[in-house]
Regions:
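Short basic, glycine-rich beta-strand/loop surfaces that mediate nucleic-acid
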Residues: 7, 49, 53-57, 67-81, ...
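General beta-strand structural signal in soluble alpha/beta enzymes
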Residues: 5-7, 31, 57-60, 80, ...
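Long, hydrophobic N-terminal alpha-helical segment
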Residues: 1-55
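Ordered, amphipathic secondary-structure segments that act as subunit-interaction surfaces
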Residues: 58-104
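Glycine-rich, aromatic-bearing surface loops/beta-hairpins
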Residues: 94, 99-156
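Short, ordered loop/turn segments at secondary-structure junctions
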Residues: 9, 33-36, 60-64, 85-86, ...
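Short coil/turn connectors at secondary-structure junctions
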Residues: 1-2, 24-27, 54, 74-77, ...
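C-terminal catalytic "cap/lid" subdomain
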Residues: 13, 33-34, 69, 78-81, ...
Length: 156
């Protein structure tokens, strides 16, 4: 069962490794990212950040989809972390039962529009969020558990 599905360009860091699992009761963190799954240094750093008593998987998106659709995942309380709306959409389209997505931190850069202090959208992000919303998934932006959620529609 997915307890938190979050877009965060930093993926695993203090808040996602320590604060969120306590808030959601997650006993497993799945980092779904194709490039990180091949990067031994980043994997090593993330493993050092993982909370005690919480299983950590760092796997490509396709493998995450397979796992999230398996019976084994149904027995876990999973915090699912992705870096981009593209990866979030891939998962939203392929995994049943997702009801919510937290758009927390999306990095700025050339060609991106800052829509809030923590969110910068590339043109494709607007469309990806619309597709996720069309699946009936609630998408809200908040960084910390006690922040007030802002519906993503405000920024589209």
């Amino acid at each position: 069962m997915i307890t938190l599905f979050r877009i965060d360009f930093r993926l695993l860091h203090f808040q996602t490794a320590q604060v969120w699992p306590q808030k959601t009761g997650a006993n497993e963190i799945v980092v779904a990212n194709d490039s990180v799954a091949k990067d031994a240094l980043r994997i090593s750093l993330m493993k050092m950040s993982a909370p005690h008593g919480c299983k950590l998987k760092i796997i490509p998106v396709a493998e995450a989809i397979t796992y999230l659709n398996s019976e084994a995942s149904k027995e876990r309380k999973i915090e699912l972390l992705v870096e981009t709306t593209h990866d979030a959409l891939r998962i939203a389209e392929a995994v049943e039962g997702i009801t919510a997505l937290n758009a927390a931190l999306m990095k700025g850069g050339e060609g991106k529009k800052m829509v809030s202090p923590s969110l910068a959208f590339a043109p494709e992000d607007f469309e990806n969020f619309r597709k996720i919303l069309a699946k009936g998934i609630r998408v809200e932006s908040y960084v910390a558990p006690d922040d007030r959620p802002v519906p993503i529609e405000k920024y589209l």
